[in-house]
Amino acid sequence: MKPLSLLLAVASALGTAVSAGPAVIECWMVEDAGGGRLAKKPAALLLRQGPGTPPPRPDLEPELYLKVHDPAGTLQAAVRRYPSDAPPPHCELSRFIPLPASARWARGLTPGRSCPRALDGAWLMASVLSPIFSLSCLLRPQSEPQPEPALFTSATAVLTVLTYSPIAQIQLGQDALLDLRFAYMPSISEAAASLAPGPPPFGLEWRRQHLGKGHLLLAATPGLHEQMPAAQDGAVAFAAWDDDDPWGPWTGNGTLWLPAVQPFQEGTYLATVHLPYLQGQVALELSVQKPPKISLTPAPLVWAAPGEAPPELLCLVSRFYPAKGLEVEWELRGGPEGSFQKAEGQSWLSALRHHSDGSVSLSAHLQPIPVTAKHHGARYACRVHHPTLPTLGRSAEVTLEVAGLSGPSLEDSVGLFLSAFLLLGLIKALGWVAASRSTSKDPKEKKAQ
């Protein structure tokens, strides 16, 4: 049993290591180089390490090799969920300057317009993008001296804004839930400057950008009783701190709920969390979709005489979204050339028909070529490809019957039997009625004699 226990322990350790996500996130430090140009330098976020000092990175400047301390654990929790076989996330670092919120509705967060001296010093904003999560993390490098030569820089994650739904695909007419969570842990100097225990006031802002236009969707400052702009499109946000621990760290929720999503609500959603003089923002992409319904007429059979063309086939592709990306193919299955081939004939598409819910419909037409006896039993199929459908698409089909080659089917045989049975019963009934009438007339005739 000991070897088995050891094997299970090793397997468990390997599973934990695989699911723990990357220990280092490679980044680019992006700065303004003047003249409308940007300068980029390699950087890295060290999230976990083994015993001892961090592994050396001679390819990085020490101030851009950041050993991150995450008191709230939000950044670490997000990275642990990252699949080991997924491409590495995209990460950028930039300089950040603490400033009061510029929006009028958020001015209650910062009664004093000057930034406290406790926030002086260098700040960095890390933006990490991936299909799994999207986050922004406000980092404060530590100023403690290190032994020469310095190999890395320690930094604390002060404010982390995170979403686990960076790409949301919502069915047309259904509700959308755009995930947003955030965590805050003030640095030592901030905590010393603030005498009030408990989480600070915060502001939540959701904006939508689409086709070059943007507008405020929802704004909230819980507990400040400020005059807020009216929410748009029925949007509701769960804006609150999750706990009220006196000294932090604190986590909060800013998830947005949109009822019965329509196509006009597609676009980029910007979620911003405002703290006094600090901000964090993430972007989410929302797209609306609806798979098409497909019907083919005439169905289920189409008739034609040898040498004649079958009647026109109509494939109705109804109630789908988006309108782009739709393709219709006509196939002939089981024909004389083999089990599968492209159907010959003249084909065309109708114009789009728009519906009140934002979905669209169109019809595809095919006028097949004249058929021969070899086409008997073949099937015409209308195959539709659309971004909302699987790779092979979706199809509907009808069976071709060539006149003069079809024997009676089982249904026809049953129908003929039932017809004959009813006819025989009818004849017997008429004979019984006639016999009854003749019998009733005989006694009357005898009395008359």
Swiss-Prot record:
Domain of life of the organism encoding this protein: Eukaryota
Cytoplasmic topological domain residue ranges: 435-449
Location within or outside the cell: Endoplasmic reticulum membrane
Coiled coil: none
UniProt cross-references to SUPFAM superfamilies, sorted A to Z: Immunoglobulin
Site (May be involved in interaction with TAP): 428
Disulfide feature: 27-91, 315-382
Lumenal topological domain: 21-413
GO cellular component: MHC class I peptide loading complex
GO molecular function (one): MHC class I protein complex binding
Membrane topology term: Single-pass type I membrane protein
Keyword Signal: yes
Signal peptide per UniProt: 1-20
Domain Ig-like C1-type: 292-399
Spans traversing the lipid bilayer: 414-434
Gene Ontology BP, a term: antigen processing and presentation of endogenous peptide antigen via MHC class I
Key words of the record: Disulfide bond, Endoplasmic reticulum, Glycoprotein, Immunoglobulin domain, Membrane, Signal, Transmembrane, Transmembrane helix
Record InterPro entries: Ig-like_dom, Ig-like_dom_sf, Ig-like_fold, Ig/MHC_CS, Ig_C1-set, Immune_Resp_Modulators, Tapasin
Glycosylation sites: 253
UniProt domain comment: The N-terminus is required for efficient association with MHC class I molecule and for a stable interaction between MHC I and calreticulin. Binding to TAP is mediated by the C-terminal region.
Subunit structure: Heterodimer with PDIA3; disulfide-linked. Obligatory mediator for the interaction between newly assembled MHC class I molecules, calreticulin, PDIA3 and TAP. Up to 4 MHC class I/tapasin complexes bind to 1 TAP. Interacts with HLA-G-B2M complex; this interaction is required for loading of high affinity peptides. On its own or as part of MHC class I peptide loading complex, interacts with ligand-free MR1 or MR1-B2M complex, providing for stable MR1 pools ready for metabolite antigen processing.
PANTHER family per UniProt: TAPASIN
Cited function: Involved in the association of MHC class I with transporter associated with antigen processing (TAP) and in the assembly of MHC class I with peptide (peptide loading).
Stated name of the protein: Tapasin
Upper lineage: Eukaryota, Metazoa, Chordata, Craniata, Vertebrata
